[in-house]
């Protein structure tokens, strides 16, 4: 089964696959990352790799970035508009969410930019928490656009030549190492922000 799958991953088959995808036009390349912002279980990395291999590195990157950024902004605006209703009350009352809201409100751009730079950060949660917080719309848009710019470009650059990634073991190892480092650093940043928010909440409670 695995051998059959690998035998399909030739340059010719991959080119044909990506040409078929490209036939749908740039609209689908923007829509898929946009939809992922609402349905975070969808594979954003797969969409970005498909876009860069179908439309080229730069065009695929721009289309992916535009869709993902637009999706984050839409989620933020929807949550900002309807977040005070009872439907989202259980989210606002969750201790972890409240800690993140406190951190975002106090520090704004910086933490969100850092979190959104890393591919394995739950960006959907960041969008929702930002929408529930009192952070301004402009700082969020700036953080989302710049953070996604870094993150989407990293994915685009690593996954641009999918055939070479499969057939050249050294490049594959390097890509895996880079992804592992990004995951590790992202988790460290996420944990640091969580601890800092907990400390500030504790200090505030003692005053």
Curated annotation (Swiss-Prot):
Transmembrane segments annotated in the record for this chain: 28-48, 59-79, 112-132, 140-160, 165-185
Keywords, alphabetical: Cell membrane, Membrane, Transmembrane, Transmembrane helix
Subcellular location: Cell membrane
Methyltransferase among keywords: no
Membrane topology: Multi-pass membrane protein
UniProt keyword Cell inner membrane, yes or no: no
InterPro entries: TMEM64, VTT_dom
Domain of life: Bacteria
Cellular component annotations (GO), alphabetically ordered: plasma membrane
Signal peptide: none
UniProt name for this protein: Uncharacterized membrane protein YhjE
């Amino acid at each position: 089964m695995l051998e059959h799958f690998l035998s399909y991953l030739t340059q010719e088959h991959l080119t044909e696959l990506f040409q078929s995808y490209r036939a749908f036009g740039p609209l689908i390349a923007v829509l898929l990352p946009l939809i992922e912002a609402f349905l975070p279980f969808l594979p954003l990395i797969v969409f970005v790799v498909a876009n860069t291999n179908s439309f080229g590195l730069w065009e695929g990157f721009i289309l992916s970035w535009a869709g993902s950024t637009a999706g984050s902004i839409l989620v933020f605006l929807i949550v900002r508009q309807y977040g005070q209703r009872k439907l989202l009350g259980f989210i606002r009352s969750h201790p972890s969410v409240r800690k993140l809201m406190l951190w975002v409100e106090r520090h704004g751009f910086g933490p969100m930019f850092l979190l959104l730079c890393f591919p394995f950060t739950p960006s959907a949660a960041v969008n929702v928490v930002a929408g529930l917080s009192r952070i301004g719309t402009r700082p969020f848009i700036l953080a989302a656009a710049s953070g996604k710019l870094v993150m989407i470009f990293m994915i685009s650059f690593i996954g641009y030549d999918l055939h070479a990634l499969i057939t050249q073991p050294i490049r594959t190892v390097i890509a895996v190492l880079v992804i592992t480092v990004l995951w590790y650093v992202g988790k460290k940043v996420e944990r640091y922000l969580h601890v800092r928010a907990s400390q500030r909440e504790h200090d505030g409670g003692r005053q």
